[in-house]
């Protein structure tokens, strides 16, 4: 086990709801982005679209999983602005688009910690395009769910973008799918679900009713000691270390959390998401901010004898993604994240198999997802996320998501030179839309944005609610792109105001001027007469 002094703290507000986001990401690049081991700007070529797989009626597709809303921004955004947007949405990943509105990369909280802060870059002066993982892998809503999940586990990345017609429509987070799968399998094992029996008979024969229970025993019942080895890396810092030092520890050890320890005893935890949310988004200096100011003190921990299943339950119930582990003497020996535990559980099954049994191990993961996703969901589980529900109508066919559930929409307009510009922007922020349009038009002011409604009228967009209404209108017509109409006429309100004053009060002004002039003339005449008489 490798330990290094470093300081860290865990976020109390962390939640399992971290949107994942990235689309076309190469597997190795994805893994490096999420683990922080990838170099910056390695892959610049545009990836091919995902291979289309024929889907039979009985197979589960991505749109039936629990999808999350993706945060999408332009790759020309600064790291600071990106972090503020991520903090406002409480997400730890953001998808990036290029000038052609095509998905170009992904940035995660770990990238912020290890590629920006640890390298001494200034977030307010650094563009996200400089630190993003380029060309992430993506799937479509009709891709096989099992293949998408296996791809994420094997590639060791949590976030997988879901793309339709070139647009990012959602984000798949493997942690949500994992917890759902575990909940379903536990319910089936405890209640002897008849549905589980039917599923097993259909897939693997009537003699395999014990498969689910066996799978649980082999994958989740081993202790964390089977995961934590002498080579396990744990980053240790002191509470008095600056955040900058903690981020360098994360970078050097390729981890996304550090433990704050006193004599190797766990006193706190600091994760890459804490650095994003509590330091960068708050515009604090990483060099001057001490770890103790932003760490989570006294985090919930697990002993090395805790089972994998119990560890996952601890993390799920506490709504956090990192779990410090201590040995029998109370010393910190590891800090595991949910993806590490998941991957280790699968590896445990494969490593324990040999010969003919290994053939079963090779398909163990597929059977795990297949069986779990086909089981009856727990009572407190919503069959689909809001995003998934919008992708499937009552007949099981794909439909357009309702307003607010998709983070971006396609727009196009004709600029002053007659060129048609097309781009993707949020369908909720008028300020962001105006910023993109003005940048592309090289306009500073005097710009109004409108769209044409179903009656042929041009409706002004001047606030967020107007933009939401415009996007909703376009979706209701089945449109993939909303055409904008621009008015570059400079504002003339001040001139109109002056004109109004002239017309409404002009008579009074001229009358007052005439009276004053008359008074001056009379005074002059009187003074002249007085001087003339005095000479006589």
Swiss-Prot record:
> Main site of residence?
membrane
Query: Which PROSITE patterns is this protein grouped with?
Result: CBS, PB1
Keyword Membrane attached: yes
Its cellular-component GO annotations read: membrane
Question: Which intervals of the chain are annotated as region Disordered?
Answer: 1-60
Q: Does the keyword DNA-binding apply?
A: no
Span of domain CBS: 66-124, 132-187, 228-287, 295-354
Domain (PB1): residue spans on this chain: 406-489
- Pfam hit, one: PB1
**Segments traversing the membrane:** 509-529
> How does the protein's chain sit in the membrane according to the entry?
Single-pass membrane protein
UniProt keyword list: CBS domain, Membrane, Repeat, Transmembrane, Transmembrane helix
Which InterPro entries does this UniProt record tie to the protein?
A: CBS_dom, CBS_dom_sf, CBS_domain-containing, PB1-like, PB1_dom
CDD domains, per database record: CBS_pair_MUG70_1, CBS_pair_MUG70_2, PB1_MUG70
* Bias (Low complexity) ranges: 1-23
Where it sits in the cell: the answer is: Membrane
Looking up SMART domains in the UniProt record yields: CBS, PB1
Query: What name appears for this protein in its UniProt entry?
Result: CBS domain-containing protein CBSCBSPB2
Which species expresses this protein natively? Arabidopsis thaliana (Mouse-ear cress)
